[in-house]
Curated annotation (Swiss-Prot):
Organism annotation: Ralstonia nicotianae (strain ATCC BAA-1114 / GMI1000) (Ralstonia solanacearum)
Domain Response regulatory intervals: 8-125
Described function: Involved in chemotaxis. Part of a chemotaxis signal transduction system that modulates chemotaxis in response to various stimuli. Catalyzes the demethylation of specific methylglutamate residues introduced into the chemoreceptors (methyl-accepting chemotaxis proteins or MCP) by CheR. Also mediates the irreversible deamidation of specific glutamine residues to glutamic acid.
Enzyme class at the top of the EC tree: hydrolase
Superkingdom: Bacteria
Residue numbers bearing the 4-aspartylphosphate modification: 59
Gene, per the UniProt record: cheB
Keywords on record: Chemotaxis, Cytoplasm, Hydrolase, Phosphoprotein, Plasmid
Residues forming coiled coils: none
PTM: Phosphorylated by CheA. Phosphorylation of the N-terminal regulatory domain activates the methylesterase activity.
Protein name from the UniProt record: Protein-glutamate methylesterase/protein-glutamine glutaminase
Subcellular location: Cytoplasm
UniProt similarity note: Belongs to the CheB family.
Length: 381
């Protein structure tokens, strides 16, 4: 897209107030403009043909046609970057996760009270998400190729990264059985950070993990409420236990702990055990939870026992913390540009010098397991 051309945005929402607020926020930005608004998907279909927008904002729940039904048809017939506008309810969060699964790039949570003030408070975030969506790589919803062999050499893996153009979709039933791999230590940890596009990337990564894998701590940029539904969704799909982190609980093998929305997640120590720590200290890199907070705590408390993974996302959160992890002895992997929805956080982590290996998403899980095995962190039987 020509950088001098403004990002063309079409807003679809049954609330006249939301349409008005979004129009004000978007048109106030120097690099984007609203080319149309629609109260429902039926009217939006004609406007899409007329205006050919770069990005859509789409309400989840609307009359005449549900936002998810419309999104599914859109991604099949006319793939377009979409930012969902979602309510802060359990139903809204579950619908949003489904939208991200269908191909939406990101979402904005509607405030429960004070709609205009609440939306305007996040004007910069809304604009950033639209910018990220405009340059995002949409995920084709097609059958995936078989994952590359887990034991691929680093040189081969980096070479392969340049040849991958789409992130494979994995079915839980298709993940290889874990019976041949047993982890011999509970002291090793996998530390993961992600943002835009991360919900699906995290799902694909966790689907590769066997029930006896090291404990996994995860920060995905999400508001409060959404992480609860996210953890429940993953727990129903994966062979490991996935849960929202609780302050002070012991980190166990075969478990993944997701940072709650609006809470920083850190790795702590209690005697010989690793524990989760939560706090509401100020946002870092404009985020709470922040990936840098988790990564830095892993550098302090786990050192070489940690293996870091940074996945798709906009911005630079995690880059400084990943370098600290590397300097403390951790081995770190970044998702490659071709398989990222937005190549921001991995790019910054690479630029900072904190990354050992750059891999396409479908190779990261197998590579992590192979790395743990090769360094005595797992035993194969």
């Amino acid at each position: 897209m020509n950088e001098k051309r403004k990002i063309q945005v079409l807003c679809i929402d049954d609330s006249a107030l939301i349409r008005s607020i979004l129009k004000e926020i978007i048109n106030a930005q120097p690099d984007m403009e609203v080319v149309g608004v629609a109260p429902d998907p039926i009217i939006a279909r004609d406007l899409i043909k007329q205006t050919n927008p770069d990005v859509l904002t789409l309400d989840v729940e609307m009359p005449k046609m549900d936002g998810l039904d419309f999104l599914e048809k859109l991604m099949r017939l006319r793939p377009t970057p979409v930012v969902m506008i979602s309510s802060l309810t359990e139903r809204g969060s579950e619908a949003t996760l489904r939208a991200l699964e269908l191909g939406a790039v990101d979402f904005v949570a509607k405030p429960k009270l004070g709609m205009r003030d609440g939306m305007n408070e996040y004007a910069d975030q809304i604009a950033d998400k639209i910018r990220a969506a405009a340059r995002a790589r949409l995920r084709p919803r097609t059958a995936s190729p078989a994952p590359a062999p887990a034991a691929a050499s680093p040189a081969h893996a980096v070479h392969t990264a340049h040849a991958v153009h789409a992130r494979p979709e994995h079915d839980a039933a298709a993940v290889p059985a874990p019976a041949r791999t047993h982890f011999s230590s509970t002291e090793k940890l996998i530390i993961v950070g992600a943002s835009t596009g991360g919900t699906e990337a995290i799902k694909d990564f966790l689907l590769e993990m066997p029930p006896d894998c090291p404990g996994i701590l995860i920060v995905q940029h999400m508001p409060a409420g959404f992480t609860t539904s996210f953890a429940k969704r993953l727990d129903g799909l994966c062979r490991i236990r996935v849960k929202e982190a609780v302050h002070g609980e012991r980190v166990l093998p075969g478990h993944a702990y997701i940072a709650p929305g609006d809470m920083h997640l850190s790795l702590g120590r209690s005697g010989a055990n690793y524990v989760t720590e939560l706090d509401q200290n100020p946002p870092v890199n404009r985020h709470r939870p922040a990936v840098d907070v988790l990564f830095r705590s892993a550098a302090r408390n786990a050192g070489a026992n940690a293996l870091g993974v940074i996945l798709t996302g906009m911005g630079k959160d995690g880059a400084a913390g990943m370098l600290e992890m590397r300097n403390a002895g951790a081995y770190n992997v970044a998702q490659d540009e071709a398989s990222c929805v937005v190549y921001g956080m991995p790019k910054e982590a690479v630029a900072h010098g904190g990354v050992h290996e750059i891999l396409p998403l479908h190779q990261i899980g197998p590579h992590v397991l192979a790395r743990l095995s090769a360094h005595g962190r797992v035993t194969r039987v």
